[in-house]
Amino acid sequence: MIHEPNAMQRLAHDDWETALTDLLDDLLQTQQEMLQILEQKRIAMVSRNLASIRELQPREEELCRQLTACQNRRNELLAMARTANLPDGNLEQLSRSVPLQQEAGVRERLSNASHRAMLLKHQSLTNWIIAQRNLLHISQLLENITTGGQTAPTYGKNTRVAGGFILDQEA
């Protein structure tokens, strides 16, 4: 369940465990959905299925907004910790400084969120590499079309180089 950005302001300052678990549950759910979308996007990019990529874009954008909302909630929670004179460097530090009834559950959620964040980084990098490879391929195709597949010699005088059939209709 994703909360409104100002929901943290309405929480009691002593209800740290609920605030942490709610935030982490929302974050984990959003991260899992984003991993699935990025996997589907990777498959679509490799197969050059533009229709699938377009279909995935709105959901990916919504998940990005949800991740941003989780980040904002995290920042609000850490700001509340700061005002309560609790450690505010990160959620793990905060969780170690407040009494938790389900400490193992909170620690497991923190660990899972950290692991999924790493997976999201790797999947995003993979997709970026695929996109760059596709752009390079398109660039090479355009170069071949415009030059007729022939490049100008590095050394040589008065050497005729084909301009390509798009540019001068000679090829």
Can you name each region flagged by the protein language model?
Residues 2-6, 92-171:
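Short terminal interaction segments
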Residues 2-94:
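Extended, charge-rich alpha-helical scaffolding segments
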